[in-house]
Amino acid sequence: MTNIRKSHPLMKIINNTFIDLPTPSNISSWWNFGSLLGICLLLQILTGLFLAMHYTPDTTTAFSSVTHICRDVNYGWIIRYLHANGASMFFICLFIHVGRGLYYGSYLFLETWNIGVILLLTVMATAFMGYVLPWGQMSFWAATVITNLLSAIPYIGTDLVEWIWGGFSVDKATLTRFFAFHFILPFIITALVIVHLLFLHETGSNNPTGIPSNMDKIPFHPYYTIKDILGATLMILILLLLVLFSPDLLGDPDNYTPANPLNTPSHIKPEWYFLFAYAILRSIPNKLGGVLALALSILILALVPALHTSKQRSMMFRPLSQLLFWMLVADFLTLTWIGSQPVEHPFIIIGQLASILYFLIILVLMPVANIIENNLLKW
């Protein structure tokens, strides 16, 4: 008799995805982040659901309802901070996951990579709308500033912004629709994740060498289930340390002041995970140019497969590309820091140089380094 997990229509899918999946025997801990992202998504949906039970998407009561969750709801404070800091963990895992893909050439799985880029954009949109919901000063002004960027689009810009706002400024209509979208998008993300996995399992996983490993596969369970449990335990430990010891470490103090359209905060900035893109936006003195650079800072990932000129897939045996990759990581961290600083000397020039370097490394230096490395192979 066939085992039920191999014959039952539903169990068969789960079995082929998480149990009997043939997996390369040499994938390192950098491959843990996919499962960690899945755990983050589940955590965000669960905590978000419980928050939505007590939250009211109305400009007059939104701020008070968040305070009520923290003060009066049983364990409301921990649910709220798990949700807020869970988003930070989500983005840390996302950035590492994308970085892993860039380093080991996983972007050559085109369908998987492109769905991944769409996922990144969707998660960013969801996080942005979630940041608006507590209706604090930074929520309100971040919503005003970021949505206003669309007014840079020629001809239709102003109409588009007013259409998104549902009026002539960020108000009740904006908050209500942002709550609706913030609620529905995680389920769309879940659907995209399934498609992402579907495409990945068509080709099988990449591995650190970038060499096909079809002759050396092992079952996902028990080898990688136990490895993923270790990764998940460490991530949850870090998240709990953050939530229980310094829940506001990554937040903005301005968001503890109720939104006031008549009083602009001295320094408007988004959450830390958007600061790199925000720094690129601010480094260009022209509004439309800044918006284009902002969009390109993420969409450039979709171009990476087309810029791959190397004969080798992974960077494991390519020292020049490795150097450029770690320069890109350092540049990303520099941009994140610059985004949190006020617009004054020397931060302006540092931001401009870091922005130029960001695009230069990806569009020019990496492909050139690949060609040089190809020629070095002939020696």
From Swiss-Prot:
* A Pfam family it matches: Cytochrome_B
GO BP terms: namely: mitochondrial electron transport, ubiquinol to cytochrome c
Q: Where does heme b b566 bind?
A: 97, 196
Q: How is the cofactor bound?
A: Binds 2 heme b groups non-covalently.
What's the chief localization of this chain?
Answer: mitochondrion
- Name a GO molecular-function annotation: ubiquinol-cytochrome-c reductase activity
Does the record carry Transport as a key word?
yes
Task performed by this protein:
Component of the ubiquinol-cytochrome c reductase complex (complex III or cytochrome b-c1 complex) that is part of the mitochondrial respiratory chain. The b-c1 complex mediates electron transfer from ubiquinol to cytochrome c. Contributes to the generation of a proton gradient across the mitochondrial membrane that is then used for ATP synthesis.
Q: Which PANTHER family match?
A: CYTOCHROME B
Recorded family membership = Belongs to the cytochrome b family.
This chain belongs to which protein, by name? Cytochrome b
- Organism encoding this protein: Dicotyles tajacu (Collared peccary)
